[in-house]
C-alpha cells in the first residue's frame, strides 16, 4: 500500500488494484493540491518515426532525446527531502520505445522505487522487449485513433508478457461513430485481455487540425448516452481529464468517481528539454526550466497563480460546477459545455 499524509492532504493507493483515495482535513474534504506530486508525466524524447497526422507534439524523426543523466536529474529533483518522491511516472515522447536508452530509463525509475508506465504507438513492440519489461511496468497504453490501427499481435505481445495493457483512443469528431460501436461491445473480441480503453480528447495542437475537434452533435450525444448505459457487456473504459467537464454536464456518472484536471494540482509534466509545466498540452505556457529553478520552487511557488486561476473557472450553470475546473486552460474549444 502506498501512503502519504501531509497536513490536510492524505493519499493512499493499492498498487495491485489501482484503487486510490485522496482526502483533506476530513474524509469528506478534497485537498486543493498535493505538496508532492503523485504522478509525473515525462516526455523522454520528441523523436517518432510514425508521423501521425494528429500528433499534438508534432514529433518526427529528429533524434531529440532526453539523456539518461538528465532523466535521473528530473527524478531526483522531485524527491522531496521530507516526504519522498512521486509514486509513478508516465513516459511519453515522441515514441518512448525509439529512445536508444529506454530500458536503462526504466531501470533507473525502478531503482528509485517509482512505478514506470508508458504510452506507445506499438510499432516497436516485440516479444523480446515485452519480456524485458515484464514485472517492471505498471501499465502500457497503446495509442490509436481507429480500431483499424490496433494490431492484435502487438496486444498479444503485451498481454502474454503479463503487462497491464490499456488502449488510448484519441476521440475526435471523425471517429465518434466507431467509439459508439466500442461502447456497444462490437469490438469485445478484439479488446479481450486489455485492462481498459481510455478515450483521450482530441486537441488542436501540433499537427492536429482544429476542424477535427469534437463538436456537439447527434453522434456526440449518442456516445454520451452509451456512457450511461449499464446493461452492455464491454471493456472497462475511462476518459482523460479534458473530457471531464462534458461528463459532469451531460452524463449521469456519479461525480464521486470522476477526477477533474490534476495538472499542477496533483500531477506535473516535464518535457525532454527539462521544462516543467502543468500538463503536456501547455505549449510552452506556464513553463519553467529545471535548469533555472529547483523543482519545489516551481511546484510550491511558480504554479500558485495557475492554481488560483483554475481551481474553479467554470462559468456555466451546472449542478456540478463546484467539482469542475471549467474549460481546458490551453484549448477552451475542446470543452463543449464552455461558454
Write out the residue ranges for each language-model feature.
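A C-terminal junction/extension of Radical SAM enzymes
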Residues: 3, 196-282, 323
Amino acid at each position: 500500500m502506498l501512503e502519504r499524509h501531509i497536513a490536510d492532504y492524505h493519499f493512499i493507493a493499492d498498487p495491485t488494484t489501482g484503487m486510490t483515495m485522496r482526502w483533506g482535513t476530513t474524509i469528506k474534504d478534497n485537498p486543493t493540491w498535493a505538496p508532492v506530486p503523485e504522478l509525473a508525466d515525462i516526455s523522454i524524447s520528441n523523436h517518432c518515426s510514425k508521423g501521425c497526422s494528429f500528433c499534438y507534439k508534432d514529433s518526427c524523426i529528429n533524434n531529440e532525446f532526453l539523456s539518461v543523466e538528465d532523466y535521473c536529474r528530473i527524478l531526483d529533483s522531485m524527491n522531496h527531502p521530507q516526504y519522498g518522491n512521486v509514486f509513478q511516472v508516465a513516459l511519453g515522447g515522441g515514441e518512448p520505445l525509439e529512445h536508444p536508452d529506454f530500458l536503462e530509463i526504466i531501470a533507473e525509475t525502478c531503482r528509485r522505487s517509482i512505478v514506470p508506465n508508458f504510452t506507445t504507438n506499438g510499432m516497436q513492440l516485440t516479444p523480446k522487449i515485452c519480456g524485458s519489461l515484464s514485472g517492471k511496468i505498471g501499465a502500457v497504453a497503446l495509442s490509436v485513433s481507429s480500431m483499424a490501427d490496433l494490431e492484435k499481435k502487438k496486444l498479444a505481445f503485451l498481454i502474454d508478457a503479463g503487462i497491464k495493457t490499456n488502449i488510448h483512443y484519441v476521440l475526435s469528431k471523425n471517429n465518434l461513430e466507431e467509439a459508439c460501436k466500442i461502447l456497444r461491445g462490437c469490438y469485445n473480441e478484439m479488446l479481450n485481455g486489455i485492462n481498459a480503453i481510455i478515450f483521450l480528447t482530441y486537441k488542436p495542437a501540433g499537427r492536429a487540425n482544429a476542424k477535427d475537434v469534437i463538436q456537439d452533435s447527434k453522434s456526440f450525444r449518442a456516445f454520451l448516452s452509451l456512457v450511461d448505459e449499464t446493461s452492455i457487456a464491454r471493456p472497462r473504459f475511462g476518459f482523460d481529464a479534458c473530457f471531464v467537464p462534458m461528463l459532469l454536464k451531460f452524463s449521469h456518472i456519479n461525480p464521486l468517481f470522476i477526477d477533474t484536471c490534476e495538472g499542477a494540482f496533483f500531477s506535473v509534466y516535464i518535457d525532454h528539454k527539462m521544462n516543467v509545466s502543468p500538463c503536456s498540452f501547455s505549449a510552452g505556457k506556464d513553463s519553467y526550466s529545471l535548469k533555472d529553478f529547483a523543482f519545489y520552487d516551481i511546484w510550491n511557488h511558480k504554479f500558485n497563480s495557475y492554481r488560483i486561476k483554475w481551481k474553479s473557472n467554470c462559468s456555466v450553470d451546472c449542478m456540478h460546477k463546484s467539482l469542475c475546473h471549467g474549460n481546458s486552460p490551453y484549448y477552451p474549444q475542446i470543452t463543449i459545455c464552455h461558454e
